[in-house]
C-alpha cells in the first residue's frame, strides 16, 4: 500500500537536495580585474552508482563568483585573494547574470532559483587547521596572518598602534601634519631637505638660540666651541 506521506517526504527530500543556500569552498583562481573567482566546493556531493551504493564526489567548480570586499561611500577594503584561501559561497535565490553584467535593477536572464551558478564568495571563514593565532581581545586589527605586521585601534584606551617587522613608508602629495604635546622618535633621524622651526633646538644641553661661544676675540678669526 502506497503511503502518500512517504511519497511526499521522498519528493521533498529530492527537491531539497537541489536547493543551494551556502557552502564552504576553496579558492582555485582569482580575477582581480573582474573581481570574481573560481571556487571548489569543500563539501562533496553524493551519488548512487549502478549498484545502488552511495559515493562521495567533488561538486562542479563554481566559476565567476563575485568576491566581496567590504566597501561603501567611495571607500573599499581590499586584500590579496590567493589559490587555497577558504571562503563561504552564498547562492542567490534568483539568477544574477543580468545584474552582474550591467548593474542596477535588471530582469532575470534565467528563471533558475538557488542555483550553483549564482554564488558570491565571502572570504575570512576558516576551518580549524587554518585558524590564525593571537586574536586580539581588546583591539580591532588590520593584520597579516602571522601577526608580524598590524595596525590596531584599542577600544578601551582609544590608542592606535602600528607594528611591523619590515619597513614603513608614508607618502603624501600634500602636507603631513602631526599634532601632539610631545613627539618621541627612538632612533637616528635623517632629513633630506630644509628644517624650519619656530622654537629652540638643543644638541645635548646646548641651545641653538641662546648658546654662547668660547675663545672669542675681535677680528677675523674663528670662535671656539659653544658654551653649554
Locate predicted features.
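Low-complexity, small-hydrophobic/phenylalanine-enriched stretches
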Residues: 142, 151-164, 168-172, 176-185, ...
